[in-house]
Amino acid sequence: MGVAPVSNQPLVAQQPKGIIDPSTGKPIGSNDPFFGEINNELADKGFLVTSTDELINWARTGSLMWMTFGLACCAVEMMQLSMPRYDVERFGFAPRASPRQSDVMIVAGTLTNKMAPALRKVYDQMPEPRYVISMGSCANGGGYYHYSYSVVRGCDRIVPIDIYVPGCPPTAEALLYGVLLLQKKIRRTGTIER
């Protein structure tokens, strides 16, 4: 009645292969060392073992909330990042309107002496850990207005900067690359390399 013959060989479950992408049949992220390590651990044990710090850093890199601090023309390129062509939210990088809800501040444009205290105040309102991306030549070092009496020669004189994105104005691709570098930097937080 459809019963398999009894054999003396023990029944062994199939070796788990990790997380399989249904469209390709290969493990997800097979060319990425980070995902390769996760897939190897899943294939070996069937579950993941991690420390709380690693879990928190993993969650932090995938759920960064950014706040715009658009001061000049670079802000237009920064806005492009949220549009459908680049869709930065697919990397877990979502915009927020309040500094109290954001982890990352993107300073885009020329920082004047009158605006510097406001920048510092907004930075101080952000919860720890907080990160700053300096976008464009003006934010990085004064840019075209470097010798002006009313311009701060780089926002790193006011707040600590984690990632510098060069350009006048930098493209949305350059800013997206800066976001990915920031996520990479957050992954290694807690090591000497920070």
UniProtKB/Swiss-Prot annotation:
Reaction it catalyzes: a quinone + NADH + 5 H(+)(in) = a quinol + NAD(+) + 4 H(+)(out)
Signal peptide start and end residues: none
Pfam family, one: Oxidored_q6
Chain positions recorded as [4Fe-4S] cluster binding sites: C73, C74, C138, C168
Known EC number: 7.1.1.-
SUPFAM superfamilies linked to this entry: HydA/Nqo6-like (SSF56770)
GO CC annotation, single: respiratory chain complex I
Keyword terms of this UniProt record: 4Fe-4S, Cell inner membrane, Cell membrane, Iron, Iron-sulfur, Membrane, Metal-binding, NAD, Quinone, Translocase, Transport, Ubiquinone
One BP annotation, GO: aerobic respiration
Gene3D superfamilies per the UniProt record, alphabetical: 3.40.50.12280
Essential cofactor(s): [4Fe-4S] cluster
Localization terms from the record: Cell inner membrane
Membrane topology, as annotated: Peripheral membrane protein
GO molecular function, one term: quinone binding
Enzyme class at the top of the EC tree: translocase
PANTHER family in alphabetical order: NADH DEHYDROGENASE, NADH DEHYDROGENASE [UBIQUINONE] IRON-SULFUR PROTEIN 7, MITOCHONDRIAL
Membership in a protein family: Belongs to the complex I 20 kDa subunit family.
Known function: NDH-1 shuttles electrons from NADH, via FMN and iron-sulfur (Fe-S) centers, to quinones in the respiratory chain. The immediate electron acceptor for the enzyme in this species is believed to be ubiquinone. Couples the redox reaction to proton translocation (for every two electrons transferred, four hydrogen ions are translocated across the cytoplasmic membrane), and thus conserves the redox energy in a proton gradient.
Subunit structure: NDH-1 is composed of 14 different subunits. Subunits NuoB, C, D, E, F, and G constitute the peripheral sector of the complex.
Protein name in the entry: NADH-quinone oxidoreductase subunit B
Biological source species: Rhizobium johnstonii (strain DSM 114642 / LMG 32736 / 3841) (Rhizobium leguminosarum bv. viciae)
